[in-house]
């Protein structure tokens, strides 16, 4: 895990061509929450005067940050122009707009809308993840625990997604706000002010 990598400086698990499966270890050792663990302590930004970074932590944080930047660039480029790979050969945005079957098997407007609304990566998938996993898992674990929030091994505390920074509630709220924004076609819109791009 993260602590082992920091202790040993064995970064081969997280850099270079490693397993990209979201369910497998390497992918889960180099994302946002890994950086969060190193930047926050007990829900507060880490005080470097009292808790300075060790050499391996700095290197780990650098590698994780580079990976997040690369992933963000790939997401942007995949949407805008494609990555030229078998998974993302051309612009996903254009495929959604054209919905003519020429790319990504999006053959009509209904398939494009269905992708946005349903499935693991659609609005329904995100809202279900917030409700059934991000909120339910910690509550269930907490209810079955000693209910001691100061216990560093309390499963209810450890099940909270952003427990290093304690930003989980903001994360959950913003997940739902992102669904609302996508549904109404812009930020801070509603039924009365929905844009032409709205699914409403």
Enumerate the predicted regions with their spans.
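Mature extracytoplasmic or organellar-lumen-exposed domains after removal of signal/transit peptides
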Residues: 1-200
């Amino acid at each position: 895990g993260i602590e082992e990598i920091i202790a040993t400086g064995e970064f081969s698990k997280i850099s270079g061509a490693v397993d990209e499966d979201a369910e497998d270890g390497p992918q889960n050792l180099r994302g946002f929450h890994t950086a969060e663990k190193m930047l926050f302590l007990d829900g507060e930004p880490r005080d470097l005067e009292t808790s300075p970074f060790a050499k391996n932590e700095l290197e780990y944080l650098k590698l994780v940050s580079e990976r997040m930047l690369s992933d963000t660039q790939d997401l942007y480029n995949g949407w805008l122009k494609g990555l030229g790979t078998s998974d993302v050969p051309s612009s996903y945005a254009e495929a959604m707009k054209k919905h003519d079957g020429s790319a990504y098997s999006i053959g009509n407007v209904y398939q494009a809308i269905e992708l946005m609304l349903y499935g693991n990566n659609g609005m329904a998938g995100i809202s279900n993840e917030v409700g059934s996993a991000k909120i339910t898992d910690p509550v269930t674990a907490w209810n079955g625990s000693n209910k001691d929030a100061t216990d560093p091994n309390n499963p209810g505390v450890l099940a909270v997604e952003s427990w290093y920074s304690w930003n989980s509630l903001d994360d959950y709220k913003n997940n739902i706000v992102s669904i609302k924004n996508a549904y109404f076609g812009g930020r801070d819109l509603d039924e009365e002010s929905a844009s032409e791009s709205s699914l409403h």
